């Protein structure tokens, strides 16, 4: 509901929210006209560079990049490119502090903890030691950033980011 109310018309949405975004296309069906670029395979880490490409290809249109924390780390340097090229990209990083999509894939092939994946293997899917701070990472590359923990805070942060052109990052802490 937050995106439907706030997404600017003609936004290009780049969606790599693998475990938290399954219903987003349907949820934004009533939003102003926009385009949706989404993950079509199993690879992760594509959303940040794809958002850069979308912003360069259509500089008159805002870009909303929906990314997860684990995937973002594959191509985090794209934030620097966003600043360097003065691209109008709002990046929302869903921070669930884990490679949840990889946990799901382990379950799909029957390799859960009880059936084979040991504690060491499962610990490799955890992103809390150390916990990544995307607000500081973004700031270090020159991207204005905020951290949010509620839907209301997310709405406020989206209003802030959409109000001015240029790159912005919102780290959304997921339960």
Predicted regions and their residues:
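Active-site diphosphate/adenylate-binding microenvironment
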Residues: 1-60
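Short coil/turn segments at beta-strand junctions that form active-site/ligand-binding loops
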Residues: 9-11, 61-62, 87, 166
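Structural detector of well-ordered beta-strand residues that form the stable sheet scaffold
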Residues: 13-14, 37, 64, 90, ...
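Short gly/pro/ser/thr-enriched loop/turn and capping motifs at secondary-structure boundaries
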Residues: 21-22, 43-45, 72-73, 97-101
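Short acidic, glycine/serine/threonine-rich loops at helix termini
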Residues: 23-29, 49, 76-79, 101-106
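A short, small-residue-rich loop immediately preceding and capping a beta-strand
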Residues: 60-74, 89-94
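Thiamine diphosphate
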Residues: 85-175
């Amino acid at each position: 509901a937050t995106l439907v109310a706030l997404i600017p018309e003609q936004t290009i949405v780049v969606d790599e929210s693998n475990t938290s975004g399954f219903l987003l296309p349907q949820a934004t069906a009533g939003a102003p006209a926009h385009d949706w670029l989404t993950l079509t395979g199993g690879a992760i880490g594509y959303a940040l560079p794809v958002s850069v490409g979308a912003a360069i290809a259509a500089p008159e249109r805002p870009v909303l990049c929906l990314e997860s924390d684990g995937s973002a780390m594959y191509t985090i340097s794209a934030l620097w490119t966003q600043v360097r090229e003065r691209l109008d990209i709002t990046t929302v990083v869903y921070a669930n502090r884990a490679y949840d999509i990889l946990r799901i894939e382990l379950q799909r092939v029957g390799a859960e903890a009880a059936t084979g994946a040991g504690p060491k293997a499962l610990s490799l899917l955890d992103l809390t030691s150390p916990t990544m701070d995307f607000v500081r990472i973004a700031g270090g590359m020159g991207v204005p950033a905020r951290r949010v923990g509620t839907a209301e805070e997310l709405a406020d942060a989206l209003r802030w980011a959409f109000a001015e052109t240029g790159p912005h990052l919102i780290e959304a802490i997921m339960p």
